[in-house]
Amino acid sequence: MAPKTEPGRRVVADNRSARFHYAIEDTFEAGIALTGTEVKSLRGGKATIGESYAGPSGNDLMLFNAYIPEYLEANRFNHDTKRPRRLLLHRRQINKLIGATQRQGYTVIPLKIYFNDKGRAKVELGLGKGKQLHDKRESVKQRDWQRDKARLMRDKG
C-alpha cells in the first residue's frame, strides 16, 4: 500500500536510511535558498539526499552534499549539482542546531525535501545522534517483530 501523505505536500526526496543510522530526537522544517534551475529540476522529482548533512557556515546553516541534477532544458546558466545551499530558519532555531552540533555531538540530517501547499521547497531536518551497531540490531528486531505481529493478526482474523 502506498504511504499516506499530508494534503498539499509532495515529497521529492526521502532519506529513509537516516532513521536507521541516527536516533532522531527533534525535527525542524526549513526553507532552502535555490536558483531557478534547481527548483525546476526538483519539480521534476529528481534529487538525492542520502549522503547529505547540514552544518554551520558562518552564522548560517547550510545543506551540504545534496545532489540536485542539472535542469535539462537549461543551457549555460545551469547550477552546480552539489553546491552548498543555505537553509532558511529563524535565528533561535539556527542557534539551537549549531549549539547542539558543536557542544553535544549531535548531527543535523535532512529527512525529506518536499513542496508545501504554497509550492515552496522545504526540507525536513532531523537532529539526532548516530546509532551504535547494537542499536541498529535492536531496530531491526523491533521492525521484524512488528511485521510478524501484523502477519499473525491478519492470519487469525
UniProtKB/Swiss-Prot annotation:
SUPFAM superfamilies: Small protein B (SmpB). GO terms for cellular component: cytosol. The keyword Cytoplasm applies. Its main location: cytoplasm. Keywords: Cytoplasm, RNA-binding. It holds the Pfam family SmpB. One of its GO terms (molecular function) is RNA binding. GO terms for biological process: trans-translation. Residues 131-157 are annotated as: Disordered. Signal peptide: none annotated. InterPro entries: SmpB (IPR023620), SsrA-bd_prot (IPR000037), SsrA-bd_prot_CS (IPR020081). It is found in: Cytoplasm. The keyword RNA-binding applies. CDD domains: SmpB (cd09294). Residues 132-157 have a biased composition (Basic and acidic residues). Required for rescue of stalled ribosomes mediated by trans-translation. Binds to transfer-messenger RNA (tmRNA), required for stable association of tmRNA with ribosomes. tmRNA and SmpB together mimic tRNA shape, replacing the anticodon stem-loop with SmpB. tmRNA is encoded by the ssrA gene; the 2 termini fold to resemble tRNA(Ala) and it encodes a 'tag peptide', a short internal open reading frame. During trans-translation Ala-aminoacylated tmRNA acts like a tRNA, entering the A-site of stalled ribosomes, displacing the stalled mRNA. NCBIfam families: PRK05422.1 (NF003843), smpB (TIGR00086). Belongs to the SmpB family. This is SsrA-binding protein. It comes from Methylorubrum populi (strain ATCC BAA-705 / NCIMB 13946 / BJ001) (Methylobacterium populi).
